[in-house]
Amino acid sequence: MMPSESGAESLEQPAAQVGTGAASAVATAGAAGGGPDPEASSASLGRHQSRLSWPQVKRLDALLKEPIPIHGRGNFPTLSVQPQQIVQVVRSSLEEHGLRVHSVRLHGSAASHVLHPESGLGYKDLDLVFQMDLRSEVSFQLTKAVVLACLLDFLPAGVSRAKITPLTLKEAYVQKLVKVCTDLDRWSLISLSNKSGKNVELKFVDSVRRQFEFSIDSFQIILDSLLLFGQCSSTPMSEAFHPTVTGESLYGDFAEALEHLQHRVIATRSPEEIRGGGLLKYCHLLVRGFRPRPSTDVRALQRYMCSRFFIDFPDLVEQRRILERYLEAHFGGAEAARRYACLVTLHQVVNESTVCLMSHERRQTLDLIAMLALQALAEQGPAAMAALAWRRPGSDGVVPATVNYYVTPMQPLLPRAHSYPTWLPCN
């Protein structure tokens, strides 16, 4: 999932209703071929691209065919949506309304999972990127209207569609609507709700300055050939007969980025361009066992990310909202025990690398992180709560169930009362 950028504008205006005769969508894509040819791959592709192997293509096909529930609010029924179905329906409808889609791509953690599922990161959101032209406000509004109208095609049989409007569908099934329209960024995002956090995120991109934070999340997989193969071929895929699927790395070097993913290496380019959420992703990777590349200036990298975090989220209330939302999205269910480890790591990074705040602002943020860490520790049970010292968790992110009574004195986890007065904003 990609968070709202600075300057993002919510798409809240009601959209005109668009026809829904797109259930039998046919996506236009490159011709599907047989198995990958290594020699052809090396000769025809740049360093930022690579052909997917047969096991990777199988994982991609299974991911696109796995039904994902889109949960409705109130009395609206749950929709069962296969990613490949909604891509085909939306793409066909967009092109019927004069909006040409250049390509459709799988982006982010899901693409990384397809390429190397043993990384330990898994994936939550399913990021589907539609590369297209968005040159006017009309294009943005038409894109939103098309997606909302296409949701009608996925309503269960027997549900009356007569009085359902696009505004009703937005309120029922859309978790987030974002529009970014600046000189360098022109894109919109429609996120469909899923209670377990596996949201289907449809992103419509004309241009964007940066779509990745680190090399390991810079992958995009072009879906066009696989989608076309599924529509046109009656023969099941096999190792000897399957479409040629291409992956790209926005980091710039596909092989290097894949090696980073396989060996749990944190690397990036132009760290000053990383958005505010990159700090949380960095701490997340550290907790998962990733480590910065030896040649990385870690202190400079952390300073860039801390500065950007406080530029994008200057308000303490907003910081808490972002932290809680990130923890819920990435450390839910069985992963909840890792929240404490992530917050301990975040506290350490902010404490060591923040140079852009006044001292009282820095203390307020550190106290907020400490409070959330204490809550996460309490959720691990009474035994964990017995250790209220600031202690580094084990490699699995879990505080040991048995806590020794003798604890070496360390920095306390509980926030201290500060003597400074409440600061009021200047007029």
From Swiss-Prot:
Transmembrane segments: none annotated. The keyword Transmembrane does not apply. InterPro entries: TET5 (IPR012937). It is found in: Cytoplasm; Nucleus. Residues 15-30 have a biased composition (Low complexity). Residues 1-49 are annotated as: Disordered. The keyword Hydrolase does not apply. Keywords: Cytoplasm, Nucleotidyltransferase, Nucleus, Transferase. It catalyses: RNA(n) + ATP = RNA(n)-3'-adenine ribonucleotide + diphosphate. Coiled coil: none annotated. Its EC number is 2.7.7.19. Its main location: cytoplasm. GO terms for molecular function: poly(A) RNA polymerase activity. GO terms for biological process: negative regulation of apoptotic process; negative regulation of cell cycle; negative regulation of cell population proliferation; positive regulation of translation. GO terms for cellular component: cytoplasm; nucleus. Catalyzes the transfer of one adenosine molecule from an ATP to an mRNA poly(A) tail bearing a 3'-OH terminal group in an ATP hydrolysis-dependent manner. May be involved in maintaining the translation efficiency of at least some genes through preventing degradation of their mRNAs. Prefers RNA molecules that are adenosine-rich close to 3'-end. In addition, may inhibit cell proliferation and cell cycle progression through ubiquitination of beta-catenin/CTNNB1. Belongs to the TENT family. This is Terminal nucleotidyltransferase 5B. It comes from Mus musculus.
